[in-house]
Amino acid sequence: MSIRSHEQYALLTDYDTGSAYSEAYHTVFANIRFSWESDSTPQHTLLLATPSPYTEQAGVVANVAIVAAQSGTSTILVDADLRTPSLQQRFSLGKSSGLSELLAEESITPEKVAASLCKTFIPNLRLLGAGDTTRGGASLLLSSKLETIINCLRNLAAEAETSRGLVIFHSPPVLSGADASLISAQVEQTFLTMVAGRTTRVQVKQAQEQLQRSHAKLVGSILLDV
């Protein structure tokens, strides 16, 4: 799957639905959806991660989530990049509690997770932002609490009126630490995004090996800037 270079930083809502930019993301989502439509589970979880730092990665994940929501899928987008969060700003949402605060809770309940979700201006799309990342230490709690949070998010997606639900995670780069690997071990599918001319074969190989050690289900890739 590929997306040509055309301001990946911008949200799809800034473009005409018939534009090549928009069509590229619809093609990407169609391929993602094809990979899980045969699954009997109506709620699906996935991670889109890049091997090395890429500033437009958050925009790529946001646009895939937008297409999913526009297709009628109840979609929850999670900003799990607790180092450089940006999704709340991209959707023009004010500061609010998010993933960092949930990870700091002694007991995580569906009610607490639901209260942390923000509605976006796009129907069917809600955001769990990174929250206040200045407190530090949140990443250390991912391994012990992420499974509970994902189960709550899955159930919240199931409560929507649409027939299918999707939870999409945005994470730090795979090779920058353990966060992406921890998330990939908990979600059903992981896709690697690679940037032509920037992402090297060595980085891709190292990222694949790291994800495989986490028992991630790596099912595909997205090529940017071709």
Q: Where in this protein do the model-derived segments appear?
A:
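Hydrophobic positions on the alpha1 helix immediately C-terminal to the Walker A/P-loop
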Residues: V60
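Short amphipathic alpha-helix
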Residues: N63-V64, A138
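Short, well-ordered turn and helix-capping elements at secondary-structure junctions
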Residues: I32, S52, D132, S171-P173, ...
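Conserved catalytic-core segment of NTP-binding enzymes
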Residues: S139-V226
